[in-house]
Amino acid sequence: MARLNESTASSEPIEILKRRFVRQNREIARVNSIQSLRIRSLESEVSNLLSENVSLREQIITLTQELERFEAARTLHDGVYDVKARLDSKLVELGNLITELGSLPRRYSRAVRENGEPAPARQSRESGPKEVDDTDPEPNLGFLDGRLPVIMEDKLYPRRTLTAQEVQELRDSDTDGPNCSGFEDSSISPKQRVEYDEAATGGPAYFIDTNTIVEEIENEHSLPPNLETRRKKKIGPATVNKDQADTRPISLLDSKFTRKCGAKRKFSAEDDESLFESSPSEDDEFQFSRPAQSPKLFSQNEHASADDGSGELRRPIQSPTLSSQNDHSPVKMKPQSERSIAHVHGERRVLEPKSTNTNILSPAKPSIMKDYNQNHDFGYNEKSEKPLPRQGKGAVDGSKNASPKKSSTRTPVFGNDGNKSGNKQKKSGAIKSNTPSLDGIEDSEIATTADMPSTRPSRRRGTVSQPESHKTEGISMPP
């Protein structure tokens, strides 16, 4: 241990050691440089190998693609070669047919020289369809096998047109049409029809120009020349009478209903009754009649005449519409008017339809209203609203003689009628309302219309005289 710690004295000098270390370092540096060079060369080799690998892979890909193309082309080439082989065989067969076609004239000429008749014509004649009889209504369709029959060029197919005899018959008779051989008798066969035509014309059936036929019969019957005509039925006397009977009422209606060019089509009851009259109606022993006036107005007038006490019968006051309606009733009509309107009005049968176009306010009746207002002037002035003078003493006394019980059972008192016996006041109240009464109620309750003056009359109740007030006290007013 002590020897290890002891410093040994170097036998060689220090310079020799330095040289030795320097030499060793140089050798180490040389070895390092050589190894680095070798590493660089190896790296370059690796890069070269990688590039070669990439190029080789590219070549492999291209080669595989070429191989696939070659394989596809090989299959295509195989198919082409197969088609080519079959085409060659077909060409050989076609060549054989061409050579056979070239040898056909020689064989045909040889056959003609041997037999003296063309063989194809004989074969076609033997195998061709038989002649079809056109007279047979049902040809042998099974033999034709769905084909149309053969049209022979040398056979005559006649057209069934008018013969000379039929044209002559058409000229002679106006009612008979041209005789048609095709439609005369469906049971006759075509052969019998041809024989019948020959017997009728005295020889074989011949045909004339259709243009001349059309020119001859154009005025009488406009028939096309290429169509057959059917014999017309003779018109019997029964049908002629029926046609005349049908046309007669039409002419009557036309003569009755001739109107102006601009007239409105407003139908009234007279038009409907004339329509019903045109048809012949049987007399069923039923007389239709309307009441002469409304029941309420009739009771009023009867009551007024009873209260009057005088022997003379007064004419009942009627509205214009009621008078116009009553003119149509057979009860109200005068003999002259019945004679003048005899062709319009007829007896309406039971349950026969009646016109509903009978509006009493129809604008078609202004002339009736005008005539009524002109002919019935009751002394009323439109500008003055005063009523007519009250009745005299004799009229009041005559009204007292009437029984109050009978007057109370008639009709109730309304409006301005202060007394049942005031007949003149009733008349004046009825004249004040120039408008027609619609429902047949008392004339004193009818409202004023445009025909009245512009200033409305007062609704104040008129004065009642002393005897009239005594008379009304004895009468019991209805509830």
Swiss-Prot record:
Annotated Pfam families: Shugoshin_N
Annotated localization: Nucleus; Chromosome, Centromere
GO BP of this protein: cell division; chromosome segregation
Biased composition (Basic and acidic residues): 123-132, 335-352, 379-388
Keywords, in A-Z order: Cell cycle, Cell division, Centromere, Chromosome, Chromosome partition, Coiled coil, Nucleus
Region Disordered, residue ranges: 109-145, 220-247, 263-479
Comp. bias intervals (Acidic residues): 270-286
The keyword RNA-binding appears for this protein: no
Any one of the GO CC terms: nucleus
Cell division as UniProt keyword: yes
Any coiled-coil regions, as ranges: 36-76
Known role: Plays a central role in chromosome cohesion during cell division by preventing premature dissociation of cohesin complex from centromeres after prophase, when most of cohesin complex dissociates from chromosomes arms.
Family: Belongs to the shugoshin family.
The protein's name: Shugoshin
Gene (UniProt): sgo1
